[in-house]
């Protein structure tokens, strides 16, 4: 059975939680490989809605083992709160496995994230202020704390002391904030470590053994392609690699064990935070999409910026991820429009770009070149076969598939778990 990577093909919030839950009922492991609690996804099961931030979406499926890989940065308090919240609603979290090599978001990471963003002024990135970037920075600078360190008091104290020696000076002298007490920070981390210990494991070994034994593993990415630290709209990006390559480095599983890469795209586009967004709408159409799609961030509650489908972005996602399939979500949101614009290329200072400009100055200047598609008025939420969709709706999907350079294998037609059309099997 395969190793399957599921990633966002746009700027996030594409509906990966729903797609993961759909596939997760048929797989043995669901492994989160990047990011932290800056990523939010919602899974709807019947009348119940679950907003997840750090836990893999597969936690809702009773048959899958959820895994937090080494590429994730973990805020222990947030993780424990999320576990407690789900268990209070009857969800069994005892199956959860957390990599002992994952890095920890410490209290000082959150403070640094907030003050640096506040002082950035007009140059702010639009972070969630949850300490993700500073934790990854410590990881790269080799002064980070790993989950395994929470169980070795002397090691932990040494690492916290080393980190705070520099960070306290910055907080006090540059940002006029209070210094963190080393011992208080150590004790706080030790306490959460005790609670986390039952979940901690060598997840790389477990996942590799599972694949070798013929099990199916779903690798779940947080955020999305256009927020990738290397391939996204830098510097308005996240601090990790939400692209397909991150699935390997973020779990310790080699690329030869990946059989399928599925990208999730909305039938339109949204973005949260700062940064260029060529198809962004500033008129009543943008407000309409936001209202119809309930476009507010799961993690931040911020209203999302909305725009028409951008085929240049999707072609780029197909390229950098090696997509084999696309799950198209929220097609129902477009119901009622007479015409639907689709961005087929960019105009950059009079020059046509059919492909993504890697020069971010060019991308910031990109103006969308639209093709128009006829809309539909019928309710599609109860449609379960592609051929039963309105013809203009089918034509829209086929056009997006053609422009993206990748087949659309599943289509989301509403918020419920069963509001989806599986055109091609995502597991065969």
Swiss-Prot record:
Assigned EC number: 6.3.4.4
Protein name (database record): Adenylosuccinate synthetase
Binding-site residues for GTP, renumbered to this chain: 12-18, 40-42, 304, 330-332, 412-414
Catalytic activity: IMP + L-aspartate + GTP = N(6)-(1,2-dicarboxyethyl)-AMP + GDP + phosphate + 2 H(+)
Localization: Cytoplasm
Oligomeric and partner information: Homodimer.
GO biological process, one term: IMP metabolic process
Higher taxonomy: Bacteria, Bacillati, Actinomycetota, Actinomycetes, Bifidobacteriales
Molecular function terms, GO-annotated: adenylosuccinate synthase activity; GTP binding; magnesium ion binding
Gene this protein is translated from: purA
PROSITE patterns for this protein: ADENYLOSUCCIN_SYN_1, ADENYLOSUCCIN_SYN_2
Function: Plays an important role in the de novo pathway of purine nucleotide biosynthesis. Catalyzes the first committed step in the biosynthesis of AMP from IMP.
Keywords noted in UniProt: Cytoplasm, GTP-binding, Ligase, Magnesium, Metal-binding, Nucleotide-binding, Purine biosynthesis
GO cellular component terms, semicolon-separated: cytoplasm
Record text on cofactor binding: Binds 1 Mg(2+) ion per subunit.
Active site, renumbered: 13 (proton acceptor), 41 (proton donor)
UniProt family annotation: Belongs to the adenylosuccinate synthetase family.
Residues annotated for IMP binding in this entry: 13-16, 38-41, 128, 142, 223, 238, 302
Binding locations of Mg(2+): 13, 40
Highest taxon, organism lineage: Bacteria
Pathway: Purine metabolism; AMP biosynthesis via de novo pathway; AMP from IMP: step 1/2
Entry keyword Magnesium: yes
Organism: Bifidobacterium animalis subsp. lactis (strain AD011)
Principal EC category: ligase
Binding site for substrate: 298-304
Entry cofactors: Mg(2+)
